[in-house]
Amino acid sequence: MSEQLQPQQSMNAADEIIGRPLAQGLGEQTAMLCAERSITYRELDAATNRHGNALRAHGVGKGDRVLFLMDDSPELVAAYLGTLRIGAVAVALNVRLAPRDVLYVIQDSACRLLYIDAEFLHLYQQIAGELEQPPQVVVRGDEAPAPAIIAFKHFLDGQAATLESVQVAPDDVAYWLYSSGTTGRPKAVMHAHRSVLIADRLEREYFGIKPGDRVFTTSKMFFGWSLGHSLMGGLQCGATVIVAPGWPDAERVMATAARHRPTILFSTPVMYRNLLREGAGESAAMRDIRHFVSAGEKLPENIGQQWLDTFGIPITEGIGASETVFLFLCARPDAYRIGSCGKRVPWAEVRLLDELGNEITTPDTPGLIAIRMASQFVGYWKLPETTEKALRDGWYYPGDMFSFDADGFWYHNGRADDMLKISGQWVSPGEIESCASAVPGIAEAVVVAVPNDDGLTRLTLFIVPEDPSASQQKLSEAWMTTLRGTLSIYKCPRTIQFLEELPRTATGKVQKYRLRDMLQATL
């Protein structure tokens, strides 16, 4: 059973995130580093309050949605926390949205106010004329280009640096996360104020993060992985959060590490792969990092092993979801298995179920996972049927297949709707992908299936080679030898296709539906 939180009658998420370090006397401790800037907890609290007061002055109140189309910055953090502090709902958006997606999200959320960076303002301006009820717009970076748009500095002019938080019920909605859309249009995942009560536990209990530590998350803050374990968890620990503007790439990550010297790095499998390619093993700053943590998608075993060989420190793998914000399974630095996403964390309950809903207790038996934890979402915005399917009797059913071994280590076998029946037998794409990724010269491997002309399902393996100039024939032969020597014949893909890179969402997850579309177009 998970550890139960003591019930609270009222609270505010912003108080839990930055109120704790302030109550511990850490007001002069550095809360954030961003390029040349250093912001203390006292300064962050004051900026948070100014934003909260400004939002109120512009008619934003409890339950109103506030959207953020902003690059990561101290201003984003302060505005986000200010939104929470007045009981409004904070919604950080992917800064790479197309104009039509910006239109969709504004209409879907019925937002009251939009914070936007000047560099992204053109996205809004392209669709503003289609909005029947346009939000108030606050732009950071330039003077307001039109009377209907408010310049950032004018928005905050004269606003007090003190503000009493609005106390809300723990189950009141605090923020949304738009899902990354691996299968289509994203959903707004609604989270309650209570979700932040466990924000610091992974950092504290698994990695010993405390004041003086520096937390660096390579993903952008609109992604739950970064929002939960950087903005929320890192600050709640009283640590220093490294804020890195700009779209992340390996070179930029290493430059940020060299400048700010993080003690823990939260990242994704694709970034760890790119860091290895970029020569991260030669970086003194990277070698000084105590802990490396990975989530977002399954970490290929070859990347995990290469990292361990290079740094002598494992990548600690875990798994969470937009619907839980925080990880529900995670390895420990001193208790891990390459290829596994770890064990159940103490603050979550996890069950494995068969097709009839019976709990699976036998190791190495695939089943559907069910999760219950304090941070799980309260529902999908305006999608009651989808919510009812995912949330049942207090448990969250993500539709993912897992198994666990005799020692309690869990393994992600892919989405339940990705499970394939080949020659009358169920096949896990994850098993095939792990096997293919172990072949020397293969950087990434993804399996998808489409029906052939005969109506039968056939597997295709998409491969990204480590060296684009490598012989595809030799890689194909090595792949076939390895798979046929490891897997049952019905699990071996019939065809192989080479790609320079896999299609991904902005948060790094592979978009398998686009690969299926590619195959369908060739039939």
Curated annotation (Swiss-Prot):
EC number: 6.2.1.27, 6.2.1.37
Catalytic class of the enzyme: ligase
Signal peptide region: none
Xref: NCBIfam families: benz_CoA_lig
GO term, biological process aspect, one: secondary metabolite biosynthetic process
InterPro entries hit by this protein: AMP-bd_C, AMP-bd_C_sf, AMP-dep_synth/lig_dom, ANL_N_sf, Benz_CoA_lig
Family label: Belongs to the ATP-dependent AMP-binding enzyme family. Benzoate-CoA ligase subfamily.
Catalytic activity: 4-hydroxybenzoate + ATP + CoA = 4-hydroxybenzoyl-CoA + AMP + diphosphate; 3-hydroxybenzoate + ATP + CoA = 3-hydroxybenzoyl-CoA + AMP + diphosphate
Function as written in the Swiss-Prot or TrEMBL entry: Catalyzes the ligation of 3-hydroxybenzoate or 4-hydroxybenzoate and CoA at the expense of ATP. The enzyme shows low activity towards benzoate, 4-aminobenzoate, 3-aminobenzoate, 3-fluorobenzoate, 4-fluorobenzoate, 3-chlorobenzoate, and 4-chlorobenzoate. There is no activity with 3,4-dihydroxybenzoate, 2,3-dihydroxybenzoate, and 2-hydroxybenzoate as substrates.
Database matches in PANTHER family: ACETYL-COA SYNTHETASE, ANTHRANILATE--COA LIGASE
pH and activity: Optimum pH is above 9.
Organism annotation: Thauera aromatica
One MF term in the entry's GO annotations: ATP binding
ATP-binding recorded as keyword: yes
Keywords noted in UniProt: ATP-binding, Ligase, Nucleotide-binding
Pfam families: AMP-binding (PF00501), AMP-binding_C (PF13193)
Induction info: By 3-hydroxybenzoate.
Entry protein name: 3-hydroxybenzoate--CoA/4-hydroxybenzoate--CoA ligase
